[in-house]
Amino acid sequence: MDKKSRVLIVGGTGFIGKRIVKASLALGHPTYVLFRPEALSYIDKVQMLISFKQLGAKLLEASLDDHQGLVDVVKQVDVVISAVSGGLVRHHILDQLKLVEAIKEAGNIKRFLPSEFGMDPDVVEDPLEPGNITFIDKRKVRRAIEAATIPYTYVSSNMFAGFFAGSLAQLQDAPRMMPARDKVLIYGDGNVKGVYVDEDDAGIYIVKSIDDPRTLNKTVYIRPPMNILSQKEVVEIWERLSGLSLEKIYVSEDQLLNMKDKSYVEKMARCHLYHFFIKGDLYNFEIGPNATEGTKLYPEVKYTTMDSYMERYL
């Protein structure tokens, strides 16, 4: 059996980071979790780190501002996976440029996976402001990786089900992370196809890609065939499972893009909803020669369908 790569996860206490840590351990990789000194001020993060340690992970403390400390950490592993936050509130994508410099100096990393895990920033054309900052920053990190000739894999895991299926995409202004029981906003005509992925499944696909020569210097799109669904189809799944009949309130493109008097976070959310549910930027393109698809690479992974996923909300 081939020796498993030693994996360092940066941002391992975050929403997707903790799934990557658990997937790495489950798949038998020697797993290292980098945590920043400030994480020790938060009891929930400390308890999560301890739980990783109890599962077999090695904890490493370092600041992204400590270049030599980062280099010393990177030299202990073979693969680096970054899961730093690129969210609407905490946006730290450009912090990864410090990680790129450390990896470049260390010179031993076989694969680097930057924090992506959503829409492919190189595919989305003319992203709306202010939501375009996510794509601009991710592109900067990609170009820095490529300029440094660091071996990479970019993973596009599309829409995390907890955010977009469980909420029925009710994220316009006042996010609701549980499925509605009375009425639901439908963006556009509700028929634009998107791709929904269980977060734990995403962690498995991400980790499986790190030692695979087929994913070297390529983008991996995770497109579970049964989870390529429109917003209306997800709503219909919930109605069928729950026995409810929801009132559908249709939100036009113009209404969605009316940013007047909206906060920065609300504007960011509306931009992403536009790209997902109006333009269809998750699924409106063919996978090219410099990319591949995760469920085809790893058919042994039994992914979670949205029918199954939504049962937890009953």
UniProtKB/Swiss-Prot annotation:
Keywords: NADP, Oxidoreductase
Pfam family, one: NmrA
Catalytic center residues: 138 (proton acceptor)
Gene Ontology annotations of biological process type: lignan biosynthetic process
Binding positions (substrate): 272
EC primary class: oxidoreductase
SUPFAM superfamilies (alphabetical): NAD(P)-binding Rossmann-fold domains (SSF51735)
Free-text function comment from the UniProt entry: Reductase involved in lignan biosynthesis. Catalyzes the enantioselective sequential conversion of (-)-pinoresinol into (-)-lariciresinol and of (-)-lariciresinol into (+)-secoisolariciresinol. Abstracts the 4R-hydride from the NADPH cofactor during catalysis.
Name under which the protein is recorded: Bifunctional pinoresinol-lariciresinol reductase 3
Source organism per UniProt: Thuja plicata
